Amino acid sequence: MKRNPNMAMLNANYLFPEINLRKRQFLAANPAAFLISLGIGDTTEPIPLSIAKSLAEASLGLGSLQGYSGYGPEQGIKTLRNQIAAKFYGGLMQAEEIFISDGAKCELGRLQMLFGNDISIAVQDPAYPVYVDGSLIQGVRKIIFMPCTPENQFFPDLSLVPRTDLIYFCSPNNPTGAAATRSQLEKLVGFAEANQSIIIFDSAYAHYIRDPSIPKSIFEIEGARKVALETGSFSKLAGFTGVRLGWTVIPEELKYDDGTSVKADWNRLTSTIFNGASNIAQAGGCAVLAEQGLEEVSRSIGFYLESAGIIKEALKKMGYLVFGGENAPYLWVRFEGKKSWDIFQRFLEQFHLVTTPGSGFGPSGEGFIRMTAFGHRDTILKAAKRLKAHHLIC
């Protein structure tokens, strides 16, 4: 059998496996070293107890006639969809427009399958690698990078962006930590309207936004229902990185050029290749959105943002230019004129800290590293202490 030629389009060394390889090589040469990881964005704190109990009860319930359930509705249980509509969208969206998923990453792959390969896409640069890599796997070849740098306040100059079918946009952004303002999102929606493009809006980190003036959803912007869909995630919201739960919102008004409903096609695709998110995970999601659950996850998010502030302060004292960490769990650190992998290696060898090279997120990420706020407080404090003990290393 012939290999799928689209796989040959991918970088042979995906960003995070390459980081893990370098970690292993360093530890093999320095077995006594204590590495602190501020690289991959995985949550570290326990799932709040009320939510964990709901997960356990749902699991145990499967062992009884009364509690057993098999396949659920592909769109997700109605209770959870109603809760998401009410708690996250305040009535802007209806439960019928919400689809429960097994996480945003898997959902992005299915969305890429939905739109196929005979399309053009625009992607923030830097951005989460899945937008580009997943598109390449589908066979998409027309990819436009939209530079988002400190010089343009991490928002692309749309006057320089050609018309594309899809626009991937993540706010707050991974990796830069930048959260788009209302004015910026209004420009984005207007641009999509003028070009008959569809925005895939990734809101995975929306619940880290603390500035009340910054929208948490693209659907807070007038006109977005006609040009956008949105993905959401419980991973960073509630520590569900291992549980796997998310959602996608597709408005009734979102149509293709021929007037066909995007939502109808999405329902058909997911009904064909997806049996729905785990019943256990969805029970946990309902617990997250209960009053107690929301209070508990808000405290967890506050904990991570405090950690971001600790690391940011240490980096600034060293003399670095640092972005993010206020409305997102990511810090974006600039090293003018340097290569990202060189900086990664210096942090690994000098501080015994694992970071993420900015170049792995796109051409405009060269000269940056990403650091995350995900870590136990004692390790965050140790990392900050190591940083404060040094001056500029580059």
Where are these regions (language model features)?
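Helix C-cap/helix->beta junction micro-motif
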Residues: 30, 138, 194-195, 318, ...
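PLP-dependent enzyme catalytic core of the Aspartate aminotransferase-like
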Residues: 92, 346-355, 360-394
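Generic structural signal for small/hydrophobic residues in well-ordered secondary structure
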Residues: 19, 38, 55, 84, ...
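Conserved core segment of the aminotransferase class I/II
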Residues: 221-302, 309, 313, 391
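Conserved glycine-rich beta-strand-loop-beta hairpin in the small C-terminal domain of fold type I
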Residues: 282, 286, 301-312, 322-334, ...
